[in-house]
């Protein structure tokens, strides 16, 4: 699927390294930079791919995913906002609505190291029907040798959020994650609390843990 995105015809050339393309009628911003190749769907401000120069693709994207308006894209980095997981109110979508809304490309900047893209989502009639708050939400992607994502919300409310990343992993037994703290809730083991002995999370078996920080 990622190769298909980069083979799409250019609808609008925004800069020498930035273009707008379409898949199934949905707009995708494609970064084709000497230092990095990446793509972001305007539906959900959803990072679909990120490949630094000389490296393998960092993200996984399902070949069967839908890009139709309002559909949740399977893979990449979904933005879960203004809540993560099931809603406390029955009938509302899991993981909020930001990932199913149409965002706008608000700003972009490119230099020798890569590109920075900023997308914006504002409250509208559809979001207010689900969540009665006015807001402006920005998603900022710094794409180069590394990938950094920032969410910036403006308004008066309380939220939870997540960047629900699908990594492209070769050998899961070789993967280790640090910096999450020592304490976790083990959802595989009836939500029992546990502690990492060295602060490093490995994946020898099925793992579904929530870090407590």
PLM segments and residue spans:
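Hydrophobic small-molecule pocket/channel-lining residues, especially in calycin-type beta-barrels
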Residues: 54-57, 61, 127-134, 156, ...
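Extended, loop-rich substrate-binding clefts of extracytoplasmic carbohydrate-active enzymes
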Residues: 92-144
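Beta-strand/loop-rich accessory regions of lumenal/periplasmic or secreted enzymes
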Residues: 70-99, 178-192, 199-200
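Short, hydrophobic/aromatic beta-strand segments
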Residues: 49-51, 156-163
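Residues that act as N-cap/strand-start positions at coil-to-secondary-structure junctions
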Residues: 23-25, 34, 44, 97-102, ...
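Active-site/ligand-binding surface loops and adjacent short beta/alpha elements
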Residues: 158, 165-213
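Beta-strand-rich N-terminal accessory domains
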Residues: 1-73
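Short, well-ordered beta-strand segments enriched in hydrophobic/aromatic residues
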Residues: 38-40, 141, 147-155
């Amino acid at each position: 699927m990622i190769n298909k995105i980069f083979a799409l015809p250019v609808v609008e050339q925004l800069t020498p390294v930035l273009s707008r393309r379409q898949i199934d009628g949905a707009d995708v911003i494609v970064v084709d930079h000497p230092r990095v190749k990446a793509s972001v769907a305007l539906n959900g401000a959803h990072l679909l791919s990120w490949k630094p120069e000389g490296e393998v693709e960092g993200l996984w994207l399902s070949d069967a995913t839908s890009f139709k308006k309002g559909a949740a894209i399977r893979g990449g980095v979904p933005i879960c906002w203004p809540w993560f997981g099931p809603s406390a109110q029955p009938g509302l979508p899991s993981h909020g609505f930001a990932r199913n809304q149409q965002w706008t490309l608000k700003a972009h900047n490119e230099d020798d190291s890569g590109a920075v893209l900023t997308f914006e989502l504002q409250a509208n009639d559809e979001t207010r029907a689900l969540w009665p708050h006015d807001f402006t939400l920005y998603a900022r992607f710094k794409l180069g040798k590394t990938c950094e994502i920032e969410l910036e919300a403006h308004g008066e409310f309380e939220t939870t959020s997540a960047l629900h990343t699908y990594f492209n992993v070769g050998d899961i037994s070789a993967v280790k994650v640090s910096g999450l703290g020592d304490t976790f809730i083990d959802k595989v083991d009836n939500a029992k609390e546990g502690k990492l002995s060295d602060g490093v999370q490995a994946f020898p078996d099925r793992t579904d843990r929530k870090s407590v920080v």
